[in-house]
Swiss-Prot record:
It catalyses: tRNA(Pro) + L-proline + ATP = L-prolyl-tRNA(Pro) + AMP + diphosphate. The keyword Zinc-finger does not apply. It comes from Polynucleobacter asymbioticus (strain DSM 18221 / CIP 109841 / QLW-P1DMWA-1) (Polynucleobacter necessarius subsp. asymbioticus). Its EC number is 6.1.1.15. This is Proline--tRNA ligase. The gene is proS. Disulfide bonds: none annotated. Its main location: cytoplasm. InterPro entries: aa-tRNA-synt_IIb, aa-tRNA-synth_II, aa-tRNA-synth_II/BPL/LPL, Anticodon-bd, Anticodon-bd_dom_sf, Pro-tRNA-ligase_IIa, Pro-tRNA-synth_IIa_bac-type, Pro-tRNA-Synthase_IIa_type1. CDD domains: ProRS-INS, ProRS_anticodon_short, ProRS_core_prok. One of its GO terms (cellular component) is cytosol. It comes from the Bacteria. Catalyzes the attachment of proline to tRNA(Pro) in a two-step reaction: proline is first activated by ATP to form Pro-AMP and then transferred to the acceptor end of tRNA(Pro). As ProRS can inadvertently accommodate and process non-cognate amino acids such as alanine and cysteine, to avoid such errors it has two additional distinct editing activities against alanine. One activity is designated as 'pretransfer' editing and involves the tRNA(Pro)-independent hydrolysis of activated Ala-AMP. The lineage of its organism: Bacteria, Pseudomonadati, Pseudomonadota, Betaproteobacteria, Burkholderiales. GO terms for molecular function: aminoacyl-tRNA deacylase activity; ATP binding; proline-tRNA ligase activity. Belongs to the class-II aminoacyl-tRNA synthetase family. ProS type 1 subfamily.
Length: 580
């Protein structure tokens, strides 16, 4: 391919609304152009990267035994009403009507459609297991689209759905997909981690996320450097930091703490370590009738409540922060001075594991301007319900017992779920077993953010000059940069010959035959992220030499013209082997 026959649209400046590196570089490199908030045109080079990503995904999904199909982007509301998600999903679900006033939606995911397909097409256990996948456009009406394609509204996604006879079959399908995903991201040349995750709104019993490691990642990943343990912050287990509870050494006392409504200020006033304080948070869970049920959640003063874990406290699935009226009724004190001692008997006290093992701790006194010191379980207040409700922090003991945890940032690019029978039972998706009895199909679902992978790869691989693509994702593998293509017949002939030979060898090469200054030409391809560059000019040809340079090399090499083809092929193959 020649640059004059392609479409290069590089820019010197990034758009003013670009917040992250990937957004800035994708626009400047001519990969995308914004058409509306969270919606982008993919220019030829951007689409080429997408196609390379799709090809890797298809190859590994097919190798894992999955079967490709294509489901509609527009889906009828009736299917989503069967599972209750039509009502449950918020404004992220883009609902539309046709000319007959019938309700439809633009799919954000396809569990309902694939389950409908399976219930109509699969009858017998002999047809199971089966795993369908598609690569399709999705739409989620994000309230605030940001970070370019990383959190856009329209995006491309690979979603797969497995159907099995039983849970044991699901576990096998899940493991097969986990291994396929691992191979997909390895082939893409990305540094990534698979982490334990919460299933969230999609439901099911177990899931793992795949994160590309990047300092700019939205998600915190808790991992153990000494083992394979990894989980996202929402799901990471937090063990007690004190294995046993110490003996009480202080008498409980009420002390004045005027205008001190947070643990840090209280600890400073009382000249105590922050780790000796306890934070009290009051939540309310509305009931079908009668007053809301109240919960007081306790975490150590230097820790943060994990809201996902809190939502799993029995009775707190649908909860909210208590109102001022509810706080006054339960504690007779304003927020900032709440504590578990002397609260209404109607309040359920839930202590984090670390708090449950604390002695002589400090907490709110349920009296404005006062806190309690020397508080001890069993003596000053009843034993609490003990659960893991906090966020993990650096230095926590690893849940697998193999050291302590660290925390890094990551960008979620894949997620695998064990859905179970949530959708099949809701939609009557059954098969006849060997005894002729109807059984619900056991489902798994597996997603990869195709377009999101582009942004994640750039967040991980870039420098001050532009994008540093893994070889398997790069829009081109090699660029040939002539010094005077139209002015020198020897240069033109050498460039054309090398281009044709590399094409014949299966190398993805582009010959930049534009009438551009060398500096501008080099800057464009460093911005775009071509992994390898060959420079051919009259000066080098006089000595039968050309320049060869890798994108991350500090200096170029002089290579004999007769050897450059093999040098390029060898370098490209070595780069591919490094990520295979």
């Amino acid at each position: 391919m020649k640059a004059s026959q392609s479409f290069l649209a590089t820019l010197k400046e990034a758009p003013s609304d670009a917040e992250v590196v990937s957004h800035k570089l994708m626009v400047r490199a001519g990969l995308i152009r914004k058409i509306s908030a969270g919606i982008y045109n993919y220019l030829p080079l951007g689409l080429k990267v997408i196609r390379k990503v799709e090809n890797i995904i298809r190859e590994e999904m097919n190798r894992a035994g999955a079967i490709e199909l294509l489901m509609p982007m527009i889906q009828p509301a009736e299917l989503w009403q069967e599972t209750g998600r039509w009502e449950k999903m918020g404004p992220e679900l883009l609902r539309i009507k046709d000319r007959h006033d019938r309700d439809f939606l633009i799919q954000p995911t396809s569990e309902e459609v694939i389950t409908d397909l399976a219930r109509n097409e699969i009858r017998s256990y002999k047809q199971l297991p089966v795993n369908f996948y598609q690569i399709q456009t999705k739409f989620r009406d994000e309230r605030r689209p940001r970070f370019g394609i990383m959190r856009g509204r329209e995006f491309s996604m690979k979603d797969a759905y497995s159907f099995d006879r039983d849970t044991e079959g699901l576990k096998k399908s899940y493991q097969t997909m986990f291994e396929a995903y691992t191979q997909i991201f390895k082939r893409m040349g990305l540094e990534f981690r698979a982490v334990t995750a919460d299933n969230g709104a999609i439901g099911g019993s177990g899931s793992q996320e795949f994160h590309v490691i990047a300092d700019t990642g939205e998600d915190a990943i808790v991992y153990c450097p000494s083992s394979d343990y990894a989980a996202n912050l929402e799901a990471a287990e937090s063990l007690a930091l004190n294995a046993t509870r110490g003996a009480a050494t202080q008498t409980m006392a009420k002390v004045p703490t005027p205008d001190k409504t947070n643990c840090a200020d209280v600890a400073k006033l009382l000249n105590l370590p922050l780790e000796q304080t306890v934070k009290s948070l009051l939540f309310a869970a509305d009931q079908e009738s009668g007053p809301a049920k109240l919960f007081m959640l306790l975490v150590r003063g230097d820790h943060e409540l994990n809201e996902v874990k809190a939502s799993k406290v029995p009775g707190m699935t649908e909860s909210r922060f208590a109102t001022e009226t509810e706080i006054k009724q339960a504690c007779n004190a304003p927020a900032g001075y709440l504590g578990p001692v002397g609260v209404s008997a109607e309040v359920t006290i839930v202590a984090d594991r670390t708090v449950a093992n604390m002695a002589d701790f400090v907490c709110g006194a349920n009296d404005a301007g006062h806190h309690l010191t020397g508080v001890n379980w069993g003596r000053d207040l009843p034993e609490p319900l003990v659960l893991d409700i906090r966020n993990a922090v650096i230095g926590d003991p690893s849940p697998d017992g193999k050291g302590v945890v660290d925390i890094c940032r990551g960008i979620e690019v894949g997620h695998v779920f064990q859905l179970g029978t949530r959708y099949s039972e809701a939609m009557g998706c059954t098969y006849l077993d060997q005894q002729g009895k109807a059984q619900p199909m056991v489902m798994g679902c597996y997603g990869i953010g195709v377009t999101r992978l582009l942004g994640a790869a750039i967040e991980q691989g870039h420098d001050e000059r532009g994008i540093i693509w893994p070889i398997s994702m790069a829009p081109v593998e090699v660029v040939i940069c002539p010094m005077g293509y139209e002015k020198s017949e020897p240069v033109k002939a050498a460039c054309d010959q090398l281009h044709d030979e590399l094409v014949a060898a299966g190398i993805d090469v582009i010959l930049d035959d534009r009438n551009e200054r060398p500096g501008a030409m080099f800057a464009d391809w460093e911005l775009i992220g071509a992994p390898f560059r060959v420079v051919i000019g009259d000066r080098g040809l006089a000595d039968s030499q050309v320049e060869f340079k890798g994108r991350t090399d500090a200096d170029s090499q002089n290579i004999p013209l007769a050897q450059i083809k093999e040098k390029v092929i060898s370098a490209v193959q070595a780069a591919k082997n490094a990520v295979a």
